[in-house]
């Protein structure tokens, strides 16, 4: 066992002394040492239930014949970090999480690891660590939040708080409504209720084979989640004994399966960044084109908020990810999972309990999957759009550029009523390096939707979008503005063409004019002059490469 390097032999006398100082009984010293990376915090709703899950994981590890050691991992709530300086730290925290887990696991030579996670950048950071370390590993996502209720209707974070700001400015909602929605939109523990980034990544994790069947959609408050936590603890010891390492599960086929499930769910565009980053750690190259190829062949079968009317709890009741896999059984590859059951067998045995929530391929919401990859002279290296959240009338759109060099300036213009029908909002210098941190533009997109402009105004950015975004919102524009991408030289009044079916994004000026503007462009001064973000800005790759550190 790996842990023998810290507990066996004469030279390890001081190591054993320190281990005994923790209270470990001598009888447990020959058991596999299991690290449990817990991201519990009481500021993220999706993580407040983890203390109880920790206890069930612990019981499971003991039952399986291992000995657990818990250690803490930081987490950021993207919703609370949204719309201000804090969002600059969200994506960079993904790399920190992976690095911290690597440091702790290697320093203490754990035999296997349980990764307790739930929200946006924490889950991919943990999966990156698992792929990098290539030891036995299993993920437990803590589960989605239930719907809130107000005036007899189901409520959720995005449409009933973020979009409510625009509705209030337009006079659709009263101040009393806003105050009430603040108190009831998010009723308790769990990741936010829709197919936003946290829940999409939980579904991707299960489709990768890195969590037990049923884990992703089971709500945080269900007793079933505790049983899954217990089984996760039992299973990690089995994985250690069978010497099944993470990369035996994280194969190219696993990533193709995960992308297919993501496309069928109409998931968050952030998964493009995260799946690429995880694959990179596993030594697998996933070009952007792979996402588009799989999307073109995978129908959109599940329509959960923000693009649809269903909630994560509906997906749970309908059969969860195993049921989605059943729909896709002819489109996925055979591959092992942490459960010990092949993903194809999980799909075969699954039951579908609601045909309206998980549609058949013949009755798909859309013939293609959730994400489309666009290219053109505005984004030579690619851009990403959630095409299933765009109305049919906006799939092809030509508009006039309105340029802003920060999210804040764009947000002010939107709320001040300065954005009109036919405008294409350009938000730049918000990329991985230029931001730095590639902030999510949920506040501007929600304001656009709340003010009723989501079918007449488009938004293009080198930043990102929350999984809660809907409408013609194109992000991850590469190269980014700060590194001389063409988005940097767009001017107010330029005509912009978006053609999602043809995968085009163009600035309608001559090639000679583009070259002239690029020649005259000068990079702006770095916004950050110290700390982690400065190091991140200097070393982060472009979005088309997953915004990984190089």
UniProtKB/Swiss-Prot annotation:
PROSITE patterns: ILVD_EDD_1, ILVD_EDD_2. Its EC number is 4.2.1.9. It catalyses: (2R)-2,3-dihydroxy-3-methylbutanoate = 3-methyl-2-oxobutanoate + H2O; (2R,3R)-2,3-dihydroxy-3-methylpentanoate = (S)-3-methyl-2-oxopentanoate + H2O. Keywords: 2Fe-2S, Amino-acid biosynthesis, Branched-chain amino acid biosynthesis, Iron, Iron-sulfur, Lyase, Magnesium, Metal-binding. The active site is at residue 466. Its cofactor is [2Fe-2S] cluster; Mg(2+). The modification N6-carboxylysine is found at residue 121. GO terms for biological process: isoleucine biosynthetic process; L-valine biosynthetic process. [2Fe-2S] cluster binds at residues 119, 192. Binds 1 [2Fe-2S] cluster per subunit. This cluster acts as a Lewis acid cofactor. One of its GO terms (cellular component) is cytosol. It is an enzyme of class 4 (lyase). Mg(2+) binds at residues 78, 120-121, 440. Gene3D superfamilies: IlvD/EDD C-terminal domain-like. Pfam families: ILV_EDD_C, ILVD_EDD_N. GO terms for molecular function: 2 iron, 2 sulfur cluster binding; dihydroxy-acid dehydratase activity; hydro-lyase activity; magnesium ion binding. The keyword Iron applies. NCBIfam families: ilvD, PRK00911.1. Belongs to the IlvD/Edd family. Homodimer. This is Dihydroxy-acid dehydratase. The gene is ilvD.
